[in-house]
Curated annotation (Swiss-Prot):
Heterooligomer composed of large and small subunits. This is Exodeoxyribonuclease 7 small subunit. The gene is xseB. Transmembrane segments: none annotated. It comes from the Bacteria. Belongs to the XseB family. GO terms for biological process: DNA catabolic process. One of its GO terms (cellular component) is cytosol. The keyword ATP-binding does not apply. The keyword tRNA-binding does not apply. It catalyses: Exonucleolytic cleavage in either 5'- to 3'- or 3'- to 5'-direction to yield nucleoside 5'-phosphates. Keywords: Cytoplasm, Exonuclease, Hydrolase, Nuclease. InterPro entries: Exonuc_VII_S, Exonuc_VII_ssu_sf. It is an enzyme of class 3 (hydrolase).
Amino acid sequence: MAKQRKNAPGFEESVARLEEIIRLTEAPVTELEDMIALVEEGNKLIRHCRSILHDAELRIQTLSNPETVQDKTDTDEPDSNEFSLT
């Protein structure tokens, strides 16, 4: 299982929320301050999803060819257990 904080949303939940954020930001009635908050939340969710995908890619590489996979934990990718929407 992927390293995630218990309160961090999963990938599918994050993507669903991103889709909702897109709909809300496209709505002409969304106030500017609300739009800014939605964009900030969306950026955090995007980083979270990228981290999940990065971890999954490393796991797949390890399973596919465990002898040639280098330790890639020192990348600039955010750690999935660092998720916080606040």
